[in-house]
Swiss-Prot record:
HAMAP family: UPF0306. It comes from Enterobacter sp. (strain 638). This is UPF0306 protein Ent638_3591. InterPro entries: Split_barrel_FMN-bd, UPF0306. Belongs to the UPF0306 family.
Length: 142
């Protein structure tokens, strides 16, 4: 649990996620601001259905991605890699996460884009501030 707590603290300070989906032999990546729910260990993003990545995702797909800062000093590099699933939320679940998202990013109140949940099954946190190449791993217990 200490590993997840360390990862959660760092993720709460970031705001952009990159994720990639695969469909019929094609890969595509996207970036978005995210709301992170540490209790669910999930990211929430807004993205229009007409985007290439949303069309490739359908309502649910496997996903992989990263979240990272941009330090110039290698000793300060920190970042998360993940793999899991992305799905489009509907109904009350969507409404609830939209409220959380717009609390963090009020400008999103003007958007009607669907809410998507990225639910990692695995997180790998590289934190060079703990020592060069230090990795913390977390796996979702099913």
């Amino acid at each position: 649990m200490e590993t997840l707590a360390a990862i959660n603290r760092w993720l709460a300070k970031q705001h952009v996620v990159t994720w990639c989906v695969h469909h019929e032999g094609e890969l595509w990546c996207a970036n978005a601001f995210y709301y992170y729910d540490p209790d669910r260990v999930a990211f929430y993003v807004l993205s229009e259905d007409k985007t290439r990545h949303a069309q490739m995702t359908g309502t649910r797909a496997k996903v992989a991605g990263t979240i990272n800062g941009q330090p110039k000093n290698v000793a300060l590099i920190r970042g998360v890699q993940f793999q899991g699933e992305i799905r489009r939320l509907e109904g009350e679940e969507s409404d609830s996460m939209r409220r959380q998202y717009t609390r963090r990013f009020p400008v999103a109140l003007a958007l009607s884009a669907p809410v998507w949940e990225i639910r990692p099954d695995e997180l790998k946190f590289t934190d060079n501030t703990l020592g060069f190449g230090k990795k913390l791993h977390w796996l979702r217990a099913e």
